[in-house]
């Protein structure tokens, strides 16, 4: 499964937050950048039953910079 995180700001910090990390059972690997869009391959046990978008949004909002950041997360 792939997800897209779109944000005009803080792309490097978002990439560092997820790349090679596992958050709430979801493992992220950076797969590319297209403009303001960061693409990640996501894997995990029982991934089809996890709300990957909500987990990703929650992780960004939990950062110091994420509270005021405009971004979107979608499944590709």
Question: Which residue ranges define each predicted feature?
Answer:
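Short amphipathic alpha-helix segments
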Residues: 4-25
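A structural detector for beta-sheet-dominated domains
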Residues: 4-8, 31, 43-45, 74-76
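Generic detector of low-complexity/intrinsically disordered segments
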Residues: 11, 40-41, 71
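Contiguous segments within soluble domain cores/interaction surfaces
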Residues: 3-4, 38
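Short, intrinsically disordered low-complexity segments
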Residues: 27-60
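Conserved short hydrophobic interaction patches
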Residues: 17-21, 55-63
